Design a protein with these regions (language model features):
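Replace the tail clause
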Residues: 1-338
Length: 338
């Protein structure tokens, strides 16, 4: 049976009525997988995640999917905001396996928790087909899964070793300058010189990256790079990703022009963007940046601060539409002007 009703996490409680026999991440759940020698499904997300909601509706609320999951797997739900440690481990595994990551993060592991397969969002039929194939392999050739899990585990450990080794190697000042210059030159090759940001879509704001580029451009008197950062910040401020009515930035832009936002608003995104625009305002005195800062801080204080002085982590992308159904961006209306 589903065991999430006694949890305190908003995300886990959202799944408490699913027909899937979800369990929380705890020693009992992990022990049960070993005792029954079953593969584990570890599904990680958070309460404001749009694609988590979509996959729940399409798959985890579906009796046919639940029958497959309940019969052959131990299914564990994890709130990444409660257990960032668990999220970090399996995110590294997914990035090694697929070259990318995101949420919902869905991983299938051996009974001991070592991952053998994973990804992010899956449609119902793809999800069911994959689970059936994995179960068949586990029954007919478990040694293949064990061998793959061993190699993947070594890969995750190798990443850790490389990071630790690099932390102990301190380059000289000249070497450090050369490395940074090479990094920036390589970075410039991916710049979108028309709309700012990186030339791709979806387009994320990546405030830490532009913080670095802003400071680097200022220190090196690199006017071309400074103009690019200003182009990016200006395009973002005039794009659909910035809410000119209520303030605050959405999670990312679906298109490459910053026009169509993914409507979720995250506290940590907006906090970093306030810092970025503040530094940019110090250097340029651009009144647009000051307006962005003031509107964003007003949004955070009005919408994300609770009565006790704490902060909520996000505003969900989904809200009720006129038919009383959850829909991404239903609370927004507007049109694009060319």
């Amino acid at each position: 049976m589903n065991q999430l009703s006694q949890e305190t996490s908003p995300y886990l409680l959202q799944h408490a009525t699913n027909p899937v026999h979800w369990k929380a991440w705890n020693p009992n759940s992990l022990s049960e997988a070993k005792e029954k020698n079953k593969l584990i499904i570890i599904s990680i997300g958070y309460s404001a995640c749009h694609w988590c909601h979509v996959m729940e509706h399409e798959s985890f609320e579906d009796d046919e999917v639940a029958d497959v999951m309940n019969a052959h797997f131990i299914s564990i739900k994890v709130d990444r905001e409660e257990r960032p440690d668990v999220d970090s481990v399996y995110m590294k595994a997914i990035q090694i396996m697929t070259g990318r990551g995101g949420w919902p993060l869905n991983v299938v592991t051996l009974p001991d928790g070592r991952p053998v397969w994973g990804g992010t969002y899956f449609r119902k039929q793809d999800w069911m087909q994959t689970l059936s194939q994995l179960q068949e392999i586990y029954l007919s050739a478990p040694e293949k899964m064990i061998d793959y899990a061993d190699k993947l585990h070594q890969g995750i450990q190798y990443i850790g070793i490389i990071q630790n080794e690099n932390q102990n190697v301190i380059p000289s000042a000249v070497e450090a300058q050369e490395q940074i210059l090479a990094l920036v030159e390589k970075w410039k090759m991916s710049f979108d010189l028309e709309f700012g940001g990186i030339a791709s879509s979806p387009k994320f704001m990546m405030p830490n990256n532009y913080h670095f580029l802003l400071r680097f451009a200022h220190q090196k008197n690199d006017n071309e790079l400074l103009e690019f950062v200003n182009l990016t910040l200006t395009r973002m401020a005039f794009g659909g990703v910035f809410d000119t009515v209520d303030g605050g930035f959405s999670r990312y832009s679906v298109d490459n022009k910053w026009h169509v936002p993914h409507f979720e608003k995250m506290l940590y995104d907006n906090g970093q963007l306030v810092s970025l625009y503040s530094d940019a305002y110090k250097l340029t005195s651009n009144p647009l940046y000051k307006q962005v800062i003031e509107k964003t801080l007003s949004f955070v204080e009005r919408e994300l601060m609770n009565e006790d002085g704490g902060f909520y982590c996000a505003l969900d992308a989904d809200s009720l539409n006129a038919e009383n159904h959850l829909e991404e961006g239903a609370f927004m209306c507007g049109k694009f002007l060319n």
